[in-house]
Amino acid sequence: MEIEIQTKPFGKMQISEKQILSFPEGLLGFEDYKKFALIEEEEESVFKWLQSVEEVDLAFVVIPPSLFKKEYKPLIPEQELQGIGITDLEDGLMLVIVTVPGEDPALMTANMQGPILINKKTLLGKQFISRNESHSVREKILASAAVEMD
């Protein structure tokens, strides 16, 4: 079934109910908002939008971390993963929130310490905190991608 939502980047749009993800604990810093839609701007784009369906002004640019950091594996205890019904990181869709500075998009960063994991079957999601202290909340995406290509 299609529903209409108001989005920050695209205005009003129709989405499938199957695009609505439930975050029972909200996202870090936004615990009051539990329902989000994962929106693709263009099929070819690696960037997606995680848009709150409850608050039009709450939207995040997200990207799979494997696209620029192949060996990225956050350290998350198995019992925390079970909270969204998965037992292994590979069982979920992993995304990281991207910050794109308006003055220079080449300086965009990703929050590698706070990955989002979504159970693809139940559409339950959670933002975790990686116990790996080498993960940064402001990992430079283009610098990391360049190192990976060397």
From Swiss-Prot:
InterPro entries: Flagellar_assembly_factor_FliW, Flagellar_assmbl_FliW_dom_sf. GO terms for cellular component: cytoplasm. It comes from the Bacteria. Interacts with translational regulator CsrA and flagellin(s). Acts as an anti-CsrA protein, binds CsrA and prevents it from repressing translation of its target genes, one of which is flagellin. Binds to flagellin and participates in the assembly of the flagellum. Belongs to the FliW family. This is Flagellar assembly factor FliW.
